[in-house]
Amino acid sequence: MVPPLSRRDALKALGIAGAAALQPPGPVDTGARAAAPILPLTSTSDVHVPPRGRSFLKFSFDHPEPSVPFEGFSFGLMVFTRENAYGLDQARMSVHETDGGLEVRATGLVWAGGQQRADGEVRLALRRIPDGVEWDATVAMDRPIKAVTTVLRGVPRGRVAAGGGAFTDPGDDELLFGYPFGGGDLFVAGGMNTPLLQVEEAGGGCCYVASRDTAVRTKRFYLQPGGQGYRIEAVHEVEGWKDEHRVTLPPWRVGRAASLEAATAAHYAHLAQAYRLPDWDTRPDVPDWLRRTALVTTLHGMHYTGYIFNDYPKMLATLRWMAARMPGERILAFLAAWDGRYYWNYPAYELDPRMGGERAFRRLIDEGHDLGVRFMPMFGANAANRHQPSFPALAEAATAKVDGDTMDLNWVDWDNDRHMEGWLAYMNLGVAAWREWLGGRISAMIERFGVDAYFLDIAGGWVNNPRADMHAGIRQLVQDLRARHPGVVAVGEMHYDALLEVLPLFHAGGGGPAGPHVQRHARFFQHLSHPAPGRGSTGVHEEGFSRFDPDTLSLAPHAIPTLNVVDDTLARHQDLMDAVIRRARERAGI
């Protein structure tokens, strides 16, 4: 909570005492009394110093955070360029009443913890809304602006939920969440599919903080606990491919809702309008066969090491066995690592001779279609091996983060030498060279073999970068392929909010408190790493093994029943395969 002001601090904030010290050189507005005090807070105000639990990196001094109280909260700003961090200069701040709120103006900034001044202009607009406060801001400097953070106080301590997830108790830990894909630091921040933060209050209600943006742009939420409440940083990061000297923040909101569900429902109503999210029941990119799909089977092909779980003939034998137990037209076959060595062969996407070559693959598709089965091969939306001969022509699409540091897909130990490999470039679909290459490889599979869908791995991996918008890129890829191949379905691994407009089916997410709101727009099946019956092998996925529950069959209630097939599944675990198929038939009423 905001501490009470001493008389002297209140006088200073109102510009009544110490005016000579607070005012910048030149003319000063000496008109009406300030509409609200300016609180002389710093980065260490109202938080535990030192931290009492898990913590994140922070300044080791008192960075100025002059803030304005409004409707039970206080609001301050920080500005980040590509070379430093800036705070508002309290001596050059003023507060003015507006219709329904306040406007905070700053005609200068400080840096070096307040030891130095800088030019810059800031306007922060605070507005009352029925359940809290909405705000936006405009910031101008003489250099490109990287990010603008709102520093928010007045949110009480409590259990925390991120992105429409469930409440968890962090104790005295600091928290950091990033949208989307961890907000650019995948293994530092907790992920969130939409920029919504909720803190539980006594009596079952919650306090929420949410961005009302209408474009995919990085957001981060940092929560620092104090004795009574949280100091929250709500970070908006500017598009990395733009050199913006003047930035207008999209609206943010903080408020109180009767429940977690009430806050989530209001947020998803905004998303549906902002991103034109189609309803599942009427979306035009969902053919009838997909609506009738009752079982997804992931047929694992070749591991990174070259180990084959299922070659093309074995995949066909498995589908024949399944189609004898449920109608084949209710089965979608997801072909994982159909193209040889998993990820190593990216982005060639060519049939593998060890798995049977073109003749066996064509027979798999043709005879599978005769059974009614639909087919979906896997492609990496943003992965390319630098050692592949095609890479030099695509290198311009390799991703760097917003600060320019190269981003590789380097978080997997593919060969088990207990070290993460770094030969995979993380590619940007916003760059035409990569988008056209990948679209061409997908199109070739559709034209040559008549596959019914294509799967985009790491589809939700949007990263802010200096080159191009990844969301615009994936939208363009899907639109181009849809124009060339009407009726062929685009599917993704995981989603963020705006991606629900582009893709109708995913295989990660869709559950939790936000599940009903997400599933209004899309459907989900279970992940590639879902354990196969028996020992729980994850097939080509790097996890290795996880527990398969023979009682629940490891089926998620919110997802299309999914049966993962590895090397020993058909030979040794037909009883469990039968059980999964029976459960799928029961759910579908077959």
Predicted features, each with a name:
Residues 2-17:
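N-terminal secretory signal peptides and thylakoid transit peptides that target proteins
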Residues 4-5, 24-38:
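C-terminal segment of N-terminal export signals and the immediately downstream linker at the start
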Residues 39-332, 367, 374:
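Carbohydrate-recognition beta-sandwich/jelly-roll modules
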Residues 244-245, 250, 439, 468-590:
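Active-site-proximal substrate-binding groove within the catalytic cores of carbohydrate-active enzymes
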Residues 298-313, 345-358, 420-436, 459-469:
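The substrate-binding groove and active-site-proximal loops of carbohydrate-active enzymes
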Residues 302-395:
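Aromatic- and glycine-enriched glycan-recognition loops and surfaces
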Residues 334-337, 438-466:
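Active-site groove signature of glycoside hydrolases
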Residues 377, 381-444, 522:
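Active-site-adjacent "subsite" loops/lids of carbohydrate-active enzymes
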